[in-house]
A protein has these predicted regions:
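Gly/Ser-rich helix-loop-strand patches that form or flank binding pockets
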Residues: 1-5, 22, 33, 119-165
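Small/aliphatic-rich secondary-structure junction motif
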Residues: 2-75, 83, 94-98, 102-105
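Short, surface-exposed alpha-helical segments at coil->helix boundaries
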Residues: 79, 83-91
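Charged docking surfaces used in two-component/phosphorelay signaling
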Residues: 108-116
Length: 165
């Protein structure tokens, strides 16, 4: 057994998901190139605080409870979290879960995506994080900061960045 009571071959792979084209490419890449039979896939969402103060107060730094794929598929259930799931992403998750016998869960956080993604890696004991790159130019990256650059520098696990086509 590995630390934390996990089997040595049990992997926890996370994909940062905001439903943008780049995050969908990251999910597609993880399914095609990284995930293998029996893995745990954690879909990480980070939402801004706006309008979610009650949920933020309830779950604070630790985020939402783990949301199983069956609940993640239910639009009514996901509305309570302020997430509107994308049919393409749900189809990708359903297919991967079935074909690779994955355990798929979602986890929501509220706040700064840079910090929350790094927190999630620690809290969820993620082995590898996959995320998309929006492809900001160098000036935009300097002015706005880059979630990707921050996570690459601060996450405690390997991070794979999937660039756009």
């Amino acid at each position: 057994m590995a630390s934390g009571g996990r089997a040595d071959d049990e992997r926890r792979i996370a994909v940062a998901m905001d439903y943008s084209a780049s995050s969908k490419r990251a999910l597609d890449w993880a399914i095609a190139n990284l995930l293998r039979r029996g893995d745990h896939l954690v879909v990480l969402h980070v939402l801004h605080h706006g309008g979610e103060e009650a949920k933020h107060a309830l779950w604070g730094k630790s985020g939402s409870p783990l949301i199983p794929l069956s609940e993640f598929r239910d639009p009514t259930a996901m509305q309570q979290y302020g997430v509107h799931c994308d049919a393409e992403v749900l189809d990708m998750l359903d297919t991967a879960a079935r074909q690779l016998e994955l355990t798929v869960v979602a986890k929501l956080y509220w706040g700064d995506a840079r910090e929350k993604l790094c927190d999630a890696v620690e809290e969820q004991k993620i082995d590898t994080l996959v995320m998309g790159s929006r492809g900001l130019g160098s000036i935009q990256r300097i002015l706005l900061g880059s979630v990707t650059n921050y996570v690459l520098s601060n996450a405690s696990c390997p991070v794979t960045v999937v660039k756009g086509k």
